[in-house]
């Protein structure tokens, strides 16, 4: 009897050790793949600190700066638009590897740009990799993750995006030199290093087992699933995936599939959540934070970049909090908590800018505090949730296309918000509320932040009806739920 008990205990211990090894391995895969998110964040955030020096070096106005900033986003639209089919055809891994090469070449080209037009073209090219990584990486991680920690692992993508933004701010700060207007060039060159890390790291990673099975590579998929899920669970996962493949085997993966009645709801959710993710205005802070801090009264490019670094630190910290809670509290609780905080923060920001000329030095720090809160509430909610949800809600047959549409949407909306920010600031500046700097009047962002706050309020109401609770539910069960015509808020 004693020997039997000892054997049972030993077997259980070995099982736990094996599960621990599997979990560690999955985390390593997710972290390396999520380096694509770090590059996404770096190459979108680096422009922020470069702007003051670019304007002096090339002698350009805010309109040209908006074009340079938006060029990367237009490239991202192209990347997201054309890579859905390619990802389903070639596989997730190969597409991520290709994006790493584009990231590296684009970083060098941006740093070498001799004029604004060349920089616009370089940013356009670089944007292709941003668009590709924005859907291929979360999709890859979602398909390779065990159900119980899928939310945590996919959210690592958003964590790495925020980390990339912070690294770009720190890089900007390191190279910033008020006496050297060309210091923006090495800011861009710094993006080569993480691109090489992604290229080398992903070369050693496995392909998505779900993609492999969809292409008939059953043995390879089974080997990967045994390593990341364990032998017992792998059998169940393979059975579930096979069932879905059988259901979809006579269907052709094409764009029109997304308009089928059973897929209209997940399509609407994907586009809707990405619309609200962008139109609460978060990327105006990511791209233009030094300019916004100038408006708040900060003096000098370096001091404004320091304040931007603070934004980056808050962004990363809050995303870490989100990752911890996303598979504990669930998607909906985080969504509603975050959106409520975003609304209150934007109202406070709008009020502080409306009184910026009267508040003076105190107003600067009120702006900083509520800017930090705004970023924090975004980072614990709709920031990571947008990317997570679009990677979960589509069936295997069209998951690449669905994630591509979600990613395409975010870049279109991002481009609109980024290209119109200064125009919106000027259009919504009430006469008499202009910001006075060195005796000159400039637009006041109070109205713009108020507008974004209104959008956030609409997002809160929309989320009650359309944000699904996917915590702890397998991708195959989510697919079956849509097939039965379920309503998003009833998914549990």
Where does each model-flagged region fall?
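Alpha-helical transmembrane bundle of multi-pass membrane proteins
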Residues: 2, 10-226, 246-492
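Short intracellular "coupling" helices and adjacent cytoplasmic loop segments at the cytosolic face
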Residues: 227-237, 250
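Short, well-structured alpha-helical segments
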Residues: 234-246, 307
């Amino acid at each position: 009897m004693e020997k039997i008990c000892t054997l049972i205990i030993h077997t259980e211990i070995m099982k736990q050790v094996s599960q621990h090894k599997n979990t560690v391995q999955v985390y390593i895969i997710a972290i390396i793949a999520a380096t694509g998110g770090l590059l996404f964040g770096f190459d979108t955030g680096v422009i922020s600190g470069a702007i003051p020096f670019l304007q002096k070096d090339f002698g350009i106005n805010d309109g040209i700066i908006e074009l340079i900033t938006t060029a990367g986003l237009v490239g991202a639209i192209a990347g997201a638009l054309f890579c859905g089919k390619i990802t389903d055809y070639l596989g997730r891994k190969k597409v991520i590897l290709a994006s790493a090469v584009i990231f590296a070449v684009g970083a060098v080209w941006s740093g070498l740009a001799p004029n604004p037009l060349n920089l616009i073209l370089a940013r356009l090219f670089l944007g292709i990799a941003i668009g590709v990584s924005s859907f291929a990486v979360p999709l890859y991680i979602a398909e390779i993750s065990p159900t119980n920690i899928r939310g945590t692992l996919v959210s690592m993508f958003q964590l790495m995006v925020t980390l990339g933004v912070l690294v770009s701010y720190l890089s900007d700060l390191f190279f910033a030199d008020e006496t050297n207007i060309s210091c923006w060039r090495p800011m861009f060159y710094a993006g080569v290093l993480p691109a090489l890390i992604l290229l080398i790291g992903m070369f050693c990673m496995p392909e998505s087992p779900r993609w492999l099975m969809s292409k008939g590579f059953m043995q390879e998929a089974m080997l990967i699933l045994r390593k990341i899920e364990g032998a017992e669970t792998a059998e169940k996962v393979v059975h579930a995936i096979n069932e879905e493949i059988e259901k979809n085997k006579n269907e052709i993966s094409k764009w029109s599939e997304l308009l089928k009645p059973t897929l209209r709801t997940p399509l609407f959710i994907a586009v809707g959540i990405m619309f609200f993710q962008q139109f609460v205005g978060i990327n105006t802070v990511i791209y233009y934070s030094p300019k916004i801090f100038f408006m708040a009264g900060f003096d000098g490019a370096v001091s404004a970049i320091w304040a931007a670094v603070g934004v980056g630190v808050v962004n990363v910290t809050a995303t870490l909090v989100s990752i911890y809670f996303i598979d504990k509290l669930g998607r909906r609780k985080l969504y509603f908590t975050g959106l409520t905080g975003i609304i209150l923060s934007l109202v406070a920001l709008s009020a502080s800018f409306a009184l910026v000329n009267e508040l003076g030095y105190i107003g600067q720090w009120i702006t900083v505090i509520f800017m930090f809160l705004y970023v924090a509430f975004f980072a614990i909610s709709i920031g990571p949730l947008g990317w997570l949800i679009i990677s979960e809600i589509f069936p295997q047959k069209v998951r690449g296309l669905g994630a591509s549409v979600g990613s395409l949407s975010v870049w279109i909306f991002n481009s609109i918000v980024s290209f119109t920010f200064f125009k919106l600031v000027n259009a919504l500046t009430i006469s008499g509320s202009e910001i006075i700097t060195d005796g000159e009047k400039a637009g006041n962002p109070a109205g713009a932040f108020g507008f974004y706050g209104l959008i956030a309020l609409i997002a809160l109401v929309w989320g009650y009806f359309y944000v699904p609770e996917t915590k702890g539910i397998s991708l195959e069960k989510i697919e079956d739920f849509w097939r039965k015509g379920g309503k998003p808020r009833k998914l549990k």
